[in-house]
Amino acid sequence: MENRWQVMIVWQVDRMRIKTWNSLVKHHMYVSRKARNWFYRHHYESNNPKISSEVHIPLGEAKLVITTYWGLTTGERAWHLGHGVSIEWRQRSYRTQIDPDLADQLIHLYYFDCFAESAIRKAILGQIVSPRCEYPTGHNKVGSLQYLALSTLIKSKPRRPPLPSVRKLAEDRWNNSQKTRDHKGNHIMNGH
């Protein structure tokens, strides 16, 4: 029997980012209970030896499955370790892969309170509005002028620990240049 290949998009990430993602997911599943409907599958519960974990996020009738991998073929650079993540949207027998931004938007649609566009009308009418968006990574566009004014008026506090963001998990850190802080100009010219 011949080999059957299946091609899928796997976002290359480092091991520590996957570890942080898994611990944030578990924290919000079991401690804060904001993601209590999510399901975490360990590596030993999978038939595929390359899968290190799976997070199943119900979205109505569909679900989002974020799968992390280990032991993959390394990338073009030495620090491209063999870890990755795939993001899949499933509904019954239909499956498709999506990008991290869309995954964050879908999570935002179904979970976590938001200071939404409707808050503008509610605030004008004198009704109580949700004070802040709990999941700002789910927004990918700039809001209206009124929305921006209200969101700057109501400052959001940084959440500890932060909510798990798929965009942050799959962020491309490999091809970004290193940024140094507090080094103005050439260090040779500064006398160091």
UniProtKB/Swiss-Prot annotation:
Residues 75-114 are annotated as: RNA-binding. The record marks 150-151 as: Cleavage in virion (by viral protease). It comes from the Viruses. Residues 168-185 have a biased composition (Basic and acidic residues). Residues 40-44 are annotated as: Interaction with host APOBEC3G. One of its GO terms (biological process) is viral life cycle. It is found in: Host cytoplasm; Host cell membrane; Virion. Residues 54-72 are annotated as: Interaction with host APOBEC3F and APOBEC3G. Residues 14-17, 74-79 are annotated as: Interaction with host APOBEC3F. Residues 151-180 are annotated as: SOCS box-like. The keyword Transport does not apply. Induction: Expressed late during infection in a Rev-dependent manner. Residues 171-172 are annotated as: Membrane association. The modification Phosphoserine is found at residues 144, 165. Vif-defective viruses show catastrophic failure in reverse transcription due to APOBEC-induced mutations that initiate a DNA base repair pathway and compromise the structural integrity of the ssDNA. In the absence of Vif, the virion is morphologically abnormal. Belongs to the primate lentivirus group Vif protein family. This is Virion infectivity factor.
